[in-house]
Amino acid sequence: LRPLHPLPGAVLDYRLVAKLKSTYVDTLPDMVHPETGRLHASFNQTVAATGRLSSSDPNLQNIPIRTPLGREVRRAFVPGARGTTRRRRAFVPGEKGWVLLSADYSQIELRIMAHLSKDPALVEAFARGIDVHRDTASRLFGIPPEAVSEPQRAQAKTVNFGVLYGQGPYGLARTLGIPTGEAATFIRAYKETYAGVVAYLDRTLEEARRAGFVTTLLNRRRYIPAIRSKSAAARAAAERLAINTPIQGSAADLIKVAMVELDRRLRAGRFRGRLLLQVHDELVLECPADEVERLAALVRDAMEGALELDVPMVVNIGVGANWAEIH
């Protein structure tokens, strides 16, 4: 209704501001530790069934980033020197001479899919360092990569992840806002292009039905008893879990191995910088400005070399005075 009248837009804007205010602006300052001047979250190893870390009290993996107002909340997160003990309220400038450093895996789930499926087209795309979503769009629309428009690339990205996680024509049509028949055509073209991915997904489901569980790269198991359920709805949900878990669980394996190796190297190198947060596929550190270059190289090497895969891992580095600036 937003395009039809200003009132619905105003209501939605108010809800966004009210949510940001109640969840973050009014709440987080009261959670700052009185002695350290910092927020101290808990990271939970055994909450998410995929093996990913979750965060609580407060949840620092859920700080908004997708809207301009949400990014203003991230601007409040600033670095502080190790050992800072002065009392400091939230939402004030950080320690002078210190910065935040973000290290974010690029397309980690698609890269893991390429490794697990051994699909030639996907493996080649990552090996050549090309834009996988643009390459998919080129194949789906039958046009040269340089002719792919941004809307076409965005559609291809949605198809890449939709098919990866078992989305059918109806769900993809709703996501893209296109007719179901067109979505079915996209899915059919994707399956023809990436036959190795489809074969891997079929093998994964077959093995899950046989064994009752699926495994990650490091052989962690997730049991999925509902995959043998007599209920079609329960079975369909279990099949989605069987497809999701090896990908998301392997991503969790990868970043945890990287974190352990990074911690070892930080201690061995006597860096003043340190790891602060893990936010899904991203690590956030703080360090003195004069350590940035060395630390960025160390972090990238530890993350990209955490596990040996058939495709290269790529880590994007960002540096800034606050959490908003590093993206």
Language model: regions and residue ranges:
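Conserved catalytic core of nucleotide polymerization and phosphodiester-bond processing enzymes
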Residues: 1-327
